[in-house]
Every structure is written in C-alpha cells, then in structure tokens.
C-alpha cells in the first residue's frame, strides 16, 4: 500500500539530506520511484505561489494573511493534483514540508489563532494527513547559521530569531503529541543524524511498510 512520508524542520535543519536518506532507505525495500514533492510548490501554479511567498513583490508588501492563504492555496493544488492521484495509483510520496510547516511557521511564528489554523487545515485537507512525518529538530540559531552559509536568504529565512523560536516551540508541541511524527536531533554531526533517520525509518517500515 502506498504511503505519504513528509520531512519537516526549520531552516538549516538538513531536510534535503534527510530526504536523500529516506529515498535511499526506501529503495533498499524495493520502493525505487516514489513521487517527490515540495511545499510550497510542486505544481506549475503552486510554484508561482511559492515565488510570492519566498520572494514577495517589489511594489507591495505581502501581508501575513495573504501569505497564509497563498500557502494553503498552493497546498490544495499539490494535494489535489499530485499527491492524492499518486497515492491512488499506488505510488509512495516523499514530501519536503506539508501542513505541519504552516502550523509551526504561521501558527507559531506568525501567531495566527489556533482555531483559525485548525479550520484552514480541515477546510483544505479534510482528514488527509501524512502516514509518517520526520521532524528534523534544530536550535534556531544553528539552523540560521547553516542557512546563511548556503548563500542569499529568502523572505522567510530573513525573519528574526524569535520567529523561528516560536515556530520550533509549535513544531515540538505537535511532535510530542502525535505518534506519527518522529523527532530527529538535527544538531548532531551528519553521520549520527543520518544513522538516526535510517534507524527510525527502518523501524517504522517494519510495521507500516506493507
């Protein structure tokens, strides 16, 4: 049966490396061509929305509410046009971010009302949810240092430290109350993080991989 696996985390948490480890581990189990997605984005229209969220507009500031709505509009496109059809066709899906990012960044970081965030999720996704989320937990200071070392920061990456501290608090709140979320200490050295991801995924696949 097809599954939907999501990698989550703050900027600089190592999501791209985690995704590579997940794909390699799945391949060892004969799952060789999962559909990969990213949020925001993943469809032609959703990528346009991603550009607005990431870069803004030179002539007009993007309000927090507009940002929230763009993110959920992009998610609706991706889930409806890519993720659900892929799963229905029997394909596994590995996603770089999903709804938990909005709950953390917009709910925690931006401070949107919890009821509003729950309503947005319910309205756009219904009961659709990932089978497994691997949350890469990292101290925001370290994460931002890593992100800065990659080069020019986008609109979100330029947010102040307290934004990411609030986002991390919300991430951890969800992770500590949802058995489908596995937390990885992403502040460790690369080899240790890699081993942790593979070990956690192997355990999960042993009981959920069929």
From Swiss-Prot:
Key word Nucleotide-binding present: yes
Keyword Transcription regulation among UniProt keywords: no
PROSITE patterns per record: THYMIDYLATE_KINASE (PS01331)
Tree of life domain: Bacteria
A GO term from the CC aspect: cytosol
Binding site for ATP: 9-16
Any single biological process term in GO: dUDP biosynthetic process
Database matches in Pfam families: Thymidylate_kin (PF02223)
Top EC class for this record: transferase
Alphabetic keyword roster: ATP-binding, Kinase, Nucleotide biosynthesis, Nucleotide-binding, Transferase
Enzyme Commission code(s) on record: 2.7.4.9
Reaction equation(s) it catalyzes: dTMP + ATP = dTDP + ADP
Gene Ontology molecular function, alphabetical: ATP binding; dTMP kinase activity
Entry function: Phosphorylation of dTMP to form dTDP in both de novo and salvage pathways of dTTP synthesis.
HAMAP family, per database record: Thymidylate_kinase
Family that this chain belongs to: Belongs to the thymidylate kinase family.
Protein name per the record: Thymidylate kinase
UniProt source species: Aliivibrio salmonicida (strain LFI1238) (Vibrio salmonicida (strain LFI1238))
């Amino acid at each position: 049966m097809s599954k939907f696996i999501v990698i989550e985390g703050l900027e600089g948490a190592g999501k791209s490396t985690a995704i590579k480890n997940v794909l390699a581990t799945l391949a060892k189990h004969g799952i060789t061509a999962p559909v990969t997605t990213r949020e925001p984005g993943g469809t032609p229209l959703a990528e346009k929305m991603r550009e607005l969220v990431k870069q803004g507009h030179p002539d007009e500031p993007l309000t927090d509410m507009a940002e929230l709505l763009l993110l959920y509009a992009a998610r609706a496109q991706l889930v409806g046009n890519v993720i659900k059809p892929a799963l229905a066709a029997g394909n596994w899906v590995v996603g770089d971010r999903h709804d938990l990012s909005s709950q953390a960044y917009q709910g925690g970081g931006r401070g949107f009302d919890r009821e509003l965030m729950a309503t947005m999720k319910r309205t756009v996704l219904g009961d659709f949810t990932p089978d497994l989320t691997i949350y890469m937990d990292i101290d925001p200071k370290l994460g931002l240092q890593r992100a800065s070392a990659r080069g020019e920061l986008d609109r979100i990456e330029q947010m102040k430290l307290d934004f990411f501290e609030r986002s991390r608090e919300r991430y951890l709140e969800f992770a500590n109350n949802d058995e489908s979320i596995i937390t990885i200490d992403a502040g460790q050295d690369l080899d240790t993080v890699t081993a942790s991801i593979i070990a956690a995924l192997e355990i999960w696949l042993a009981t959920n991989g069929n």
